[in-house]
From Swiss-Prot:
Protein name from the UniProt record: Probable tubulin polyglutamylase ttll-15
PROSITE patterns per the UniProt record, alphabetical: TTL
Signal peptide location: none
Disruption phenotype: RNAi-mediated knockdown at the L1 larval stage causes a reduction in egg-laying, likely due to a defect in the egg-laying apparatus muscles.
Keyword check for Transcription regulation: no
Functional note: Probable polyglutamylase that forms polyglutamate side chains on tubulin. Probably acts when complexed with other proteins. Appears to be dispensable for polar spindle formation in dividing embryonic cells, for cilia-dependent osmotic avoidance and for male mating behavior. Regulates microtubule dynamics in uterine muscle cells.
Gene transcribed to yield this protein: ttll-15
Natural source organism: Caenorhabditis elegans
Molecular-function annotations in GO: ATP binding; ligase activity
Length: 513
C-alpha cells in the first residue's frame, strides 16, 4: 500500500470514529459522553479534524449545558459534603439537583432552592440572594421562626397547656422566688437558648441575673419504659404564615432514651433525666426489641404497641402533640407576620423544625423545645438514616422541591390561566358553598365569605387556595395541623377564608380532614 493510500485510510478511519461518536452522543447526551467526545478531538492529529475542534466543542456545549435545577446547600460550621448536611445534600442529588456549596457561592449564583442551616435572612450573601429572588425560588426558613425555636420565647409564651411553668430571667426573678417559696417541693432547671448544661438546681444555686435564660419546672413523674425516661421528636414544617399552614410528618417520630436508668433518682446525674447527644436508641431497649428489631415496626408503632399492651391509650399522646404544635404557631403568628411584613419576601418559603416532647405517667404531654434545622445526620446512629431520608422526601414533595414533572414544565403550567393549569384547575378550588349556590353573593360585597365564590374570587385568594390544593396533592405522609378556631378566632381574613374552604373540602373528601 502506498503512502497516499495509507493517509487516505487514516482520514477515513478518523471520520468514521467522529460519526460513531456523534451518533452515540445523540442517543445518550451525557456530560460523560462530552468528555469522551472532546478526548477524541484532542488526541487526533488529523488536519481534517483539528480546524473544527473549537467550533464543534462550543456548539456542543451550548446545546448540552447543565440544565439541572440548582440547590444552595450550606452550613456555617461544617462542610455540606459531610456530617450534618450529608443526607440533605444526597437527597437533592437524588432528585436531580446540582449542588452549590458555600465556597462556590456568589451574588451572581443562579439558584432554585436555598437550604441553609442557619437563619438566612440576616446573613450575607444569603440575605441579598433572597431579597433578589423570584416567586419560583424556594427558601428553607420563614421570617420570625425564632419566636418558636427560641427556648426562652417558647417556654415563656403562656400557652394554655403543654409547656411546664417557666419564668424568664432576670425580668421575672421576683415572681419565680415567690412561686418557689409557695411550692417548696417543685424541682427546677435553668435553661438558655443553647439548651446546654441543663441540671436540676435549687433557686439558691442558680444565677437568677443571667440574661436570655429562664427557669422551668421539672416534670418529675415522667413515663418510663424499662426504667428509662424518653422524649418524642416530631418533624414539623410551616409552609405559609398568611394564612397559617403547618404540617407534621405523620409517617414516624424520633424516640430517644436517656443513657441511664431514672431510678434510683439522682439530681446530680443528668444522664438519668436529660436526653443528650449520646442517648440510648430504641433498638437497645429490651421491652421494645421484639417490636422494633424483630417485627420491624416504626418508632411510633413500637411505642403504640408496647404502651397498648400496658393498657394505655396512646391516641391521647398524639392528639395532645398536634394540639400543642397548633397552639404554638397560632399564638406566635402575629409576631411572625410582623417579620414577614418587614422582609417583603418574593420567594416561596418553608421551615423544618423538630418539636421535642416528654410524657408523664398520666399521659400528659409537655413540649420541651423546638429545634430549628434539626440534626438529620445518621453519623452517630446509622439506623436513623431511613427516617431522615423519609422526612426529607416528604418535605421535598410537600414544598415543591421535587415534583413529578420537570421544573420547566412546572413553571410553564403555573404561567397558564387557572382554567388551563393541569396541576390545579379553577374547578379544583371552586366549591359548592351554600352561600354561592343560593345566590347570596350576587354582589361580591355582601360578605367576606363571598370571595370564595368563583365569580368573586380575587387573585390573591385564588393563589392561596391553589397553593393549598397543590400541597394536599403532594403531601405524602405529611399531616396538616388543625388550629383551634372554635375557641379562638382566626387572626386574619385569609385564615378565616382558608378555614371555611378547608372545612368544605373535608365534607366533600375526608382526605382533606
Amino acid at each position: 500500500m502506498g503512502l497516499l493510500d495509507s493517509k487516505l485510510c487514516m482520514m477515513i478511519l478518523a471520520v468514521s470514529v467522529l460519526i460513531i461518536d456523534i451518533n452515540f452522543e445523540a442517543r445518550i447526551g451525557t456530560f460523560f459522553d462530552l468528555r469522551l467526545r472532546t478526548s477524541y478531538f484532542k488526541k487526533s492529529s488529523s488536519p481534517l479534524l483539528s480546524h473544527t475542534d473549537s467550533e464543534e466543542d462550543l456548539n456542543y456545549l451550548s446545546k448540552h449545558e447543565d440544565k439541572r435545577p440548582v440547590a444552595i446547600v450550606t452550613g456555617s460550621y461544617e462542610s455540606a459534603h459531610t456530617g450534618h448536611m450529608m443526607h440533605i445534600r444526597e437527597m437533592f442529588e437524588h432528585t436531580g439537583y446540582k449542588i452549590v456549596t458555600k465556597n462556590e457561592l456568589s451574588l451572581d449564583t443562579k439558584w432554585d432552592v436555598m437550604w441553609h442551616h442557619e437563619y438566612s435572612f440576616t446573613q450575607e450573601p444569603f440575605k441579598t440572594l433572597i431579597k433578589n429572588a423570584s416567586p419560583n425560588q424556594i427558601v428553607n426558613h420563614v421570617p420570625g421562626s425564632g419566636f418558636y425555636t427560641s427556648k426562652v420565647q417558647l417556654a415563656t409564651s403562656d400557652l394554655s397547656n403543654g409547656v411546664p411553668k417557666a419564668f424568664q430571667l432576670p425580668a421575672e426573678k421576683s415572681k419565680l422566688l415567690e412561686y418557689a417559696e409557695k411550692n417548696p417541693d417543685v424541682l427546677w432547671v435553668q435553661k438558655d437558648n443553647t439548651h446546654r448544661n441543663i441540671k436540676i438546681k435549687s433557686t439558691n444555686d442558680m444565677d437568677l441575673s443571667k440574661n436570655n435564660s429562664f427557669v422551668q419546672k421539672f416534670v418529675d413523674n415522667p413515663l418510663l419504659i424499662d426504667n428509662k425516661k424518653f422524649d418524642i421528636g416530631i418533624y414539623t414544617v410551616v409552609t405559609s404564615l398568611l394564612p397559617l399552614r403547618v404540617y407534621i410528618y405523620d409517617g414516624d417520630v424520633l424516640i430517644r432514651f436517656c443513657p441511664e436508668d431514672y431510678h434510683p433518682f439522682d439530681a446530680n446525674n443528668v444522664d438519668k433525666y436529660v436526653v443528650g447527644d449520646d442517648y440510648t436508641p430504641i433498638w437497645e431497649i429490651n421491652s421494645l426489641k421484639k417490636y422494633f428489631n424483630t417485627q420491624k415496626m416504626s418508632f411510633k408503632s413500637t411505642i403504640d404497641s408496647y404502651l397498648g399492651m400496658q393498657g394505655m391509650d396512646t391516641s391521647k399522646i398524639w392528639l395532645q402533640i398536634r394540639n400543642i404544635i397548633g397552639e404554638v404557631f397560632r399564638t406566635q403568628q402575629t409576631k411572625m407576620l410582623m417579620s414577614l411584613q418587614n422582609l417583603k419576601l418574593n420567594p416561596q418559603y418553608f421551615e423544618l423544625s423538630r418539636f421535642d416532647f416528654v410524657v408523664d405517667d398520666q399521659l400528659n404531654v409537655f413540649l420541651m423545645e423546638a429545634n430549628m434545622s434539626p440534626n438529620l445526620s445518621s453519623g452517630h446512629f446509622k439506623q436513623n438514616q431511613i427516617l431522615y431520608e423519609q422526612v426529607l422526601m416528604n418535605i421535598f414533595s410537600l414544598t415543591g422541591i421535587s415534583t413529578p414533572i420537570t421544573k420547566e414544565a412546572d413553571i410553564l403550567f403555573k404561567s397558564r390561566t387557572s382554567e388551563q393549569n393541569p396541576l390545579v384547575n379553577s374547578r379544583d378550588i371552586n366549591l359548592p358553598l351554600k352561600f354561592c349556590v343560593e345566590n347570596k353573593c350576587e354582589s361580591c360585597d355582601e360578605a367576606p365569605e363571598c370571595q370564595l365564590c368563583g365569580h368573586c374570587m380575587n387573585t390573591e385568594t385564588r393563589k392561596i387556595l391553589e397553593q393549598t390544593f397543590v400541597e394536599n396533592s403532594n403531601r405524602k405522609q405529611m399531616k396538616r395541623i388543625q388550629f383551634d378556631y372554635e375557641n379562638h378566632h382566626p387572626l386574619t381574613k385569609e385564615d378565616h377564608l382558608l378555614t371555611l374552604w378547608l372545612s368544605t373540602k373535608c365534607q366533600l373528601d375526608n382526605t382533606w380532614c
